[in-house]
Each structure stands twice: as C-alpha cells, then as structure tokens.
A protein has these predicted regions:
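AAA+ P-loop NTPase catalytic core and its hallmark functional loops
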Residues: 2-142
C-alpha cells in the first residue's frame, strides 16, 4: 500500500484551476493550460472571471512571480535559488500545476546535486556485469 502525505496542488486547488482556465481567453504559450496572467493570479491570489476566489499560494514579492512566469513562457529554464524554507518547492509545485496541469514531475535538487544526477543514474548490477553501457544507464524524469 502506498500512502501519500498530502494531495498534489492540482488536486487540492482543482476548482480554482478549473475556474481560471475556463474564463481565460488570453493567449497561452504552447502546451500551457492557461495564460501567464492566469498563472500569476493562481499563485498570488485574486478572482477568476466567474467570481471564484483564488487563494494566494505565495505571499511575497509580486515581481518575483511575474518574472518566474515570464521566464517559463520563453524557451529558458527557471532555477529557484534560496535558503531553506523560502517556498521554492512550494512555488515550483504550484507553477507546474497551473502551467501543465501536473506537478508530479518536479525535479528537486540540493546544493550537492550534480548535473549528472539530474540527467541519469546507473543500474549498478548491470554496471558491474557489463560495465558502462546503455543497458546500465537509467534515464531520469527529464528524459521520459
């Protein structure tokens, strides 16, 4: 049996996400569920076009969220950097939920995470048996 500590952002705030997406008639980047403006409203709070109250998920500098969303709307990556406890994981989960509809494929790192750990891992039984080979390589989520 698998137990979840808590439901995902897209499950907890499904009504808010649906209300924002339904009333969102602005241009959306390719593969986005809603416009950048609606994503900012989802994260910072406000009202959906139908009057649904959108709870703030982040209380802080509005420009930080606007810049993060604008960066994601381009072809650039976004790296949230800061001391522990500053809501980086929380914000990234909500951005993923609003943009793609799923926050299940987040990649979380620490200061000690190597770039290669993000890209792939090794099946050590195969590595010992056959040496470094494609069969021993285990691709990470970014390749799925």
């Amino acid at each position: 049996m698998t137990a979840m500590l808590r439901s995902s952002a897209e499950e907890i705030f499904a009504d808010e996400l649906a209300a924002l997406a339904k009333g969102d008639d602005r241009e959306r980047p390719a593969n986005w569920k809603m416009s950048p403006q609606a994503v900012v409203t989802y994260v910072l709070g406000g009202r959906a076009p139908d009057g649904t109250v959108i709870q703030p998920k982040y209380v802080g500098n509005r420009r930080l969220i606007e810049t993060a969303v604008a960066t994601l709307a381009t072809d650039r990556a976004l790296l949230l950097l800061g001391v522990p406890g500053t809501a980086k994981s929380w914000v990234s989960e909500h951005l993923a939920a609003a943009i793609s509809g799923s926050s299940r494929r987040l990649i979380q790192c620490t200061a000690g995470t190597d770039e290669n750990q993000i890209r792939y891992g090794w099946n050590y039984a195969q590595l010992l048996a056959k040496g470094p080979s494609r069969e021993a390589l285990v691709l990470s989520l970014i390749h799925i």
